[in-house]
Swiss-Prot record:
InterPro entries: DUF755 (IPR008474), HEV_TT_vir_Orf2/Gyrovir_Vp2_N (IPR004118). Residues 227-251 have a biased composition (Basic residues). Residues 46-167, 200-280 are annotated as: Disordered. Phosphorylated at C-terminal serines. Disulfide bonds: none annotated. It comes from the Viruses. Signal peptide: none annotated. Keywords: Phosphoprotein. The keyword Hydrolase does not apply. This is Probable protein VP2. Residues 90-100 have a biased composition (Gly residues). The lineage of its organism: Viruses, Viruses incertae sedis, Anelloviridae, Alphatorquevirus. Pfam families: DUF755 (PF05501), TT_ORF2-like (PF02957). Residues 65-81 have a biased composition (Pro residues).
Length: 280
């Protein structure tokens, strides 16, 4: 920063310095002899880098005495510098008006034709800048749509707003990831279904591929094949053990007339069935 002259005169600055040191001593020590205190400690601090001062003893705070001149007062400002050149005064009185006209005449005499051309060119540039619409700074918050034209211009042009999200975390990216995941799952399921269908078709033969039999179908009437096979089977001879068991059964059955009748009826039915088979 450039140096500036002080705003107060030398006597005023000296008074402020004395008042500041007096009040600082009163706040620190509290004794009445400000000058004597300074004279007593001045010899100890003559050499630079002396020993550190001892720690101050704990004392009870005393009320600060009043200064010689009371509270510090602001000194009057310095008088303006004396010189021949003084700025012209604006308005108020004939002298001011005369000074203003004189200043305008000096300013007009200072500008040449080249300077006037530059001034006119600068003024024309200012007019052009004021008439042309400046580009609005990028907005970080949504702005309302005033008309259809503004909506179209905003949607067709690239957005200047700064994106505060990281890549892959906005709603569109998350939705795209979910859709891609579901599509992959569906593709895997369809692939499994196709494999299952192909394996089922390979395991079950096609009935159209079976060879056709050239023999004519035969109509079965009367006895079935099972009856013919029964006819051909010969009865095995009964062993001695089976004969004894049959005799015992017959002896037991002869005791009851009802059982005898039942056995006779069953034997009659068997004989009739056998006769029918042999007749056929």
């Amino acid at each position: 920063m450039p140096w500036r002259p002080p705003a107060h005169s030398v006597p005023g600055r000296e008074g402020q310095f004395y008042a500041a040191t007096f009040h600082a001593h009163a706040a620190f020590c509290g004794c009445g002899g400000f000058i004597e205190h300074l004279n007593s400690i001045h010899p100890r601090f003559l050499g630079a880098g002396g020993p550190p001062p001892p720690p101050p003893a704990l004392r009870r705070a005393l009320p600060a005495p009043e200064g010689p001149g009371g509270p510090p007062q602001h000194a009057p400002p310095n008088p303006p510098p004396e010189g021949d050149h003084q700025p012209p005064r604006r308005g108020g009185g004939a002298g001011g008006a005369g000074d203003g006209h004189a200043g305008d005449g000096d300013a007009a005499e200072e500008y040449g034709p080249e300077d006037l051309d530059l001034l006119f060119a600068a003024a024309a540039e200012d007019d052009m800048l004021s008439t042309t619409r400046a580009r609005s700074p990028p907005t970080r918050y949504p702005s309302p749509v005033r008309s259809l034209e503004s909506y179209k211009s905003v949607t067709r042009q690239g957005s200047d707003r700064k994106q505060f999200f990281t890549s892959g975390t906005k709603d569109v990216d998350c939705l795209q990831k979910e859709v891609l995941k579901e599509c992959r799952n569906t593709h895997q399921m369809m692939k499994i279904f196709r494999q299952v269908l192909q394996s089922a078709q390979l395991s079950t033969p096609d009935p159209r591929a079976w060879p056709e039999s050239k023999e004519a179908p035969t109509l079965f009437s009367g006895l079935s094949k099972t009856a013919k096979t029964r006819r051909r089977v010969k009865k095995k001879p009964l062993s001695s053990k089976n004969k004894h068991t049959k005799k015992k059964k017959r002896s037991y059955s002869s005791s009851s007339p009802s059982s005898k009748d039942n056995t006779s009826e069953s034997s009659n039915e068997d004989s009739e069935s056998c006769s029918e088979t042999y007749s056929n």
